[in-house]
Every structure is written in structure tokens, then in C-alpha cells.
Amino acid sequence: MPKITIVGAGQAGLQLGLGLLGHGYDVTVVSNRTPEEIRNGKVTSSQCMFDSSLSHERALGIDYWTGDCPQVSQIALTVPAPPPAPAGTVAFSWAGNLTATAQSVDQRVKMPRWLEEIEARGGSVVIEDADVPALEKYAADSDLVIVAAGKGEIAGLFARDDAKSVFDKPQRALALTYVHGLAASEGPQGVKFNLIPGVGEYFVFPALTTSGPCHIMTLEGIPGGPMDNWSSVTSPAEHLAESKRIIETFVPWEWDRAKDCELTDDGGVLTGKFAPVVREPVATLPSGALVLGLADVVVLNDPITGQGSNNAAKCAATYLDSILAHGDAAFDRAFMEATFASYWSYASAVTAWTSAMLGAPPAHVLELLGAASQFQPIADRFANIFNNPPDAFDWFMDPGKASAYLAEVAGAAGTGAAGTDGAASADGAAG
């Protein structure tokens, strides 16, 4: 069987490696950290994964946490009313039901187990901070080298695809805060998504971390704005305090839940900024050898739509299918480009939807979001975009399709189509 080396031990790299091992391939995974170092390190993402992504884990028998991880069954959206409405006034707030539950497992829990599973299933693990000479070594010794490490020197080998990349600078200042003691919300567990126009976003959801069930606070501030003060934060305690300040100031309806929470651990914080980018899928090493990029290496989106780990799982599944279909043929440039093209046929929709969510919402989107507080089918369909982003293009992304869909839903409910006026006039604090 072909020998395949995967450089990078995250969601995509390990999922692909385990999938290949199940079909008898000779697999080596290169990780820059041992399982124990990952367990005891800092958090790396928020990774709320939806059913269509989790299905790939279930198919490989590697979803070990469903029984322990809190299940996410809803996505709720709250938008405050603009001035001159008093602070804390809500324009609209509603919750959409997922058709199947989602879950978030801290990668400090998941990746060590998967890395150990690589060896348990007959693969090899190399602990090395791989650089270009290391890639040359692996390329000389392997039939295919896949780069799944989304940062650092080797990710820089993959040229930016200007035609597919919308942004050239960060669109949000990002911060994650893993906490215990967040008060329970009313109703089913879910993602609470708060959109503060002109300022940023705050979303929070239940998860499983190294110390058990927790909540993850995700804060996304417009760069240079009032939610972008992380450069002055110098300790985990200050990080928690700044997270609370932002919540109390900009999402006061969430303050009662958050005011008494504490960090899960000192490693449960993360900040950063990056420019979303799409890169060329194939890199040429100095020797002329070719390597194939995977997941975040080739398509890196802002986390506003929570698609990072979901994209990684789906990219790994697509690459697995392509490799299996290729058999013993040479893994040449044509194979690599066709494999990425197959993934991009899906990921292009995710990228376009995510890019749209980063901008000011157009009138038809505001109309839909407002109407979702009156029509549950709209709220439910919006929630399930996170599981199936291409569906957004059938109703959410296009003004004409949005208008037709709204009329259809209103007609089925026996009412006239509602605009944003009635929804946006609702006031009071969100529960």
C-alpha cells in the first residue's frame, strides 16, 4: 500500500490518518507536541462541530465523547436595538432548532486520544517541529506528503490564491475564554450568538474540557474597536476580567449568567488575529517535490460561523475518498489539484457565507433575521446553515430568493410577509 506522511496532528490530519489506516495504508503522522504536552497546553480553538461533520468521526469509530460532552440543540441569535434605544434594549431574539445535535470537545481532550489511536491502529507518530528540510526528508521517503499544519514556516510554502481570497488583513480581534460556573440559560442547551453591529460578536456554548463540562466564550471584536483591547492583557486573570467587561458593557442581557464564572484553567484562554485566506493547494519544495495542503493550510476562514473544525473534518473526508479512489497511481500534481477542487466545490460556499457574515448585513438579511422571531421555520433553517452552509445560497444569500422564501413561509403560516419593522421594535432584555 502507498506510504503517506501527514504533517500536523489536528482535526484534519489525525482524522485523515485514522481513515487511511482503516484501509491498510502505511501512515506516519508528524506532530510538534506529544499527547501529554497537548493535554497540558493551551486551548487552540472553540471547535463546535455539527452533525454532518461528526458523522465522519462516527464512521471511523473515533467519536469517543458523545456520552460525556454537553449536546448543543439550538442556535439562538440576539441583536440589540440601535441608539437612541437605551443600552440593553434588544431588537430581536430567537432560537432555531438543529435537526441533530452538535458538540464541542476541547482539542486538548480529543487530539491526544487520536494521536495515541494512530499508533494503536498501526500507524507511526513522529514528534518533530517540521521545517522545510523535514518535508524534503518525508517527500523522499513517502508516496504522498500532506501538510495539515496551518501555521508557521511550512504553511507559508503555499501561495495565496488572490482570486479566491477576499481579505488581506484580519477582520476580527479574537478571544476564547473557557469557563466553569456560567449560569444555566433557560430552555435547551445551545449556542447563544449575540451580534453587536459596529462592535463585534459574542457567542457562548457548552463544551467538554479536560476538567469536565464547561462553557466557551468566544469574543470577536472589529479591529481597533472597543472589543479589541487584548494587547494590554498580560495574564489569564486579566483575560477573564476583560471578557467579563466586554459582556457587561455590550451584551448586558448575558451578564447575570457570566458574572460569577471562573476560568477552567490557566490554559483556557487564547487571543489572536489573522487574515482569512485561500491558498494554492500544492507547494513545491526546493528539490522539486510536491506536497499537498489540507484544511486550514489551504482554506482559512474567520471563526464567526464556527466552521474551522467542521471544514477540517469535511476536508479530511474528501481527501480520504480521493486517495482511496486513486488506488496505486502516482500522487502527482493533477491528483493534488483535483483533490483540492473536490473539496473547494463545498468549501467555496462556506467561505462566501463566512465572508458575508463579517460585513454589515444587507437589507434582505435583516428582514430574514427579524422575521425569524415571528416564523420558527426561518429560525430553524438559519440554525441549520451551520450544519450545511451551502443551503444559505438557496434562500439567505440572495435578495430575490430571500423574498420568495419569506413569502412562502408567511403564506404557509397564513399571514402576510413580515418585514423587520415589527421585529426590530421589540424591546426588553433577552432572557
What are these regions (language model features)?
Residues M1-A12:
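Beta1/beta-strand and adjacent pyrophosphate-binding region of the FAD-binding site
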Residues V7-A9, L18-K42:
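Glycine-rich FAD pyrophosphate-binding loop
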Residues R33, E37-P83:
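N-terminal FAD cofactor-binding segment of flavoenzymes
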Residues D63-V145, A149-A159:
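Conserved N-terminal helical subregion
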Residues F158-F193:
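Central beta-strand plus flanking loop segment that forms part of the substrate or channel wall
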Residues I196-V269:
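Conserved FAD/dinucleotide-binding core of flavoprotein oxidoreductases
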Residues T271-L294, V299, P303:
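FAD-binding beta-loop-beta segment adjacent to the flavin cofactor pocket
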Residues T305-G306, D321-G431:
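C-terminal helical "tail/cap" subdomain of flavin- and related membrane-associated enzymes
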